[in-house]
Amino acid sequence: MKDEHNQEHDHLSQKEPESYQKACACKEQQGEEKQEASEKECEIKEDFELKYKEMHEKYLRVHADFENVKKRLERDKSMALEYAYEKIALDLLPVIDALLGAYKSAAEENKESALTKGLELTMEKLHEVLARHGIEGIECLEEFDPNFHNAIMQVKSEEKENGKIVQVLQQGYKYKGRVLRPAMVSIAKND
């Protein structure tokens, strides 16, 4: 019986190293698997971080583009509102010219007539309203300025030097500093 017991014990002790070896091998394999898993996790993490950075950069660019478009639209809207009167002002210029022509004609006949005074008051009121909305006549003093004046003809003038404005043929107007229509003038040429 002792022999049997010894044999069994020997048999167990022989098995133990084998199972121990298997356990060690299993642990090594698990260690390798953990290392591989850890490496894969690192790769996945690096890939994720790279993609995150790319997406974040794209987001920042798109956001910046959006802000630029938003600012441009606000500026365009502001400009459109600021110059909204420009078209109607251009349409009114021939009416103003006709009123001015009627006034000049009536003033030549009789400067003190009710018609002349009525036209004069109408012109004054019209110019007040236009000025309130940023529309004003271009001054045509002595100096010719190609930014504001359009020289239609050159005339001899003993009273004016070369290049000076002699006569205003058609009043020019500007809207908030921008020329709507240049003044049509004649300038002196004494050569």
Swiss-Prot record:
Identification of the protein by name: Protein GrpE
Gene Ontology CC annotation, any one: cytosol
Domain of life: Bacteria
Subunit structure as annotated in this protein's UniProt entry: Homodimer.
Position of the signal peptide: none
Alphabetical keyword list: Chaperone, Cytoplasm, Stress response
A GO molecular-function descriptor: unfolded protein binding
Basic and acidic residues bias locations: 1-19, 29-42
Transmembrane segments: none
Lineage of the organism: Bacteria, Pseudomonadati, Campylobacterota, Epsilonproteobacteria, Campylobacterales
Function: Participates actively in the response to hyperosmotic and heat shock by preventing the aggregation of stress-denatured proteins, in association with DnaK and GrpE. It is the nucleotide exchange factor for DnaK and may function as a thermosensor. Unfolded proteins bind initially to DnaJ; upon interaction with the DnaJ-bound protein, DnaK hydrolyzes its bound ATP, resulting in the formation of a stable complex. GrpE releases ADP from DnaK; ATP binding to DnaK triggers the release of the substrate protein, thus completing the reaction cycle.
The keyword Chaperone is assigned to this record: yes
Matching Pfam families: GrpE (PF01025)
UniProt-annotated stretches for the region Disordered: 1-42
CDD domains (alphabetical): GrpE
Subcellular location: Cytoplasm
Family: Belongs to the GrpE family.
Record-level GO BP terms: protein folding
